Amino acid sequence: MRSSLIAAIALVALAGCGRITPATVTDPAEVQRLARITVPPSAAGLQCRTECGIDPLIYGRFYIPTADLRAVLDRMPKDCKIEPYSKYSNVTSHQMSEPWWQPGQIREPQVAEWSEPGFSVNLMFGEAGQPGILTVYFFNFGL
């Protein structure tokens, strides 16, 4: 009897060690709430996933007309600046498994990164395809 109980506990523990597929978020309002960024009504191609580990994580991508970038950055603190990408960003330092996660395809990427109490916002954006359309990647997490 005792060996059956130990085997059952071991089986449950091993089942919990498998890879869990990140949850998909499709509602722009929910993405805004979780990522703490604005997703403009003009956004297209929204992809978003969440993971819960030691720190909650939300990452994704969408396309916007260049003129709508200001709306995406509306929560950025005034003392933060848009910077040219200098070969490091929380966006590019993480290799996500989704086929749409390709920040390396952005030409002349720029980044905007800031923290607020208990949360880090990390954006990378630039043109990757059609002129006048920006691809915006975000990789945001709890601290």
What does each model-found stretch correspond to?
Residues 69-71, 113-115, 121, 141-143:
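Short, surface-exposed beta-strand/loop "edge" segments at domain boundaries and coil↔beta transitions
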Residues 129-143:
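Short, low-complexity, Pro/Ser/Thr/Gly-rich segments in the mature regions of secreted, periplasmic
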